[in-house]
Amino acid sequence: MKFSPLLDALIRELQVLPGVGPKSAQRMAFQLLERERKRGMQLGQTLQRALTEIGHCQHCRTFTENSLCDICANPKRAESGQLCIVETPADVAAIEQTHLYSGRYFVLMGHLSPLDGIGPKELGLDQLDNVLQGGQWKEVILATNPTIEGDATAFYIASMAKRYQINITRIAHGVPVGGELELVDGTTLSHSLSGRRPLE
């Protein structure tokens, strides 16, 4: 069925969101128009403000409305001497939800991918090099994704950090908690076996 040009445009623009196809976008558009017009207006205003006002933290490059994010603005977060390097701001949120890490972050906003034109410059590795030179870091935790690109990025950063005599660690990955071995793919299982540690 053909809708009005404006409704078609709304449905098309909603599909920019991850996991939203034509049917889901149509349901969202109808919901906003049929029942949630006031909330839809608020959504539009908030979205416009967010896209205009949210930028990157000057230190770690995560999203924030201020020059520094809350983590970088907190001096206690530097006391651990730990710097966790992640690919995206969503990774920061995931690690923060564990409540197990109290250091600072550096967000790459991606990973090395020469075929896509993403090299060290695009990831801000020159800025990271300046951060590493500060002399305050005891440990760099490489928390890039366990993919070919994520591993390549981690190895590249590790070679940078070694110049400053910083302890370099990589997050463990392997069999998920509650997972069954027969359902785990071979690559993940091989990582788990090679990354095994003594039982304490």
UniProtKB/Swiss-Prot annotation:
InterPro entries: DNA_Rcmb_RecR, Rcmb_RecR, Rcmb_RecR_Znf, TOPRIM_dom, TOPRIM_RecR. Keywords: DNA damage, DNA recombination, DNA repair, Metal-binding, Zinc, Zinc-finger. May play a role in DNA repair. It seems to be involved in an RecBC-independent recombinational process of DNA repair. It may act with RecF and RecO. It holds the Pfam family Toprim_4. GO terms for molecular function: DNA binding; zinc ion binding. It comes from Tolumonas auensis (strain DSM 9187 / NBRC 110442 / TA 4). Residues 81-176 form the Toprim domain. A zinc finger (C4-type) spans 57-72. The keyword Protein biosynthesis does not apply. Belongs to the RecR family. This is Recombination protein RecR.
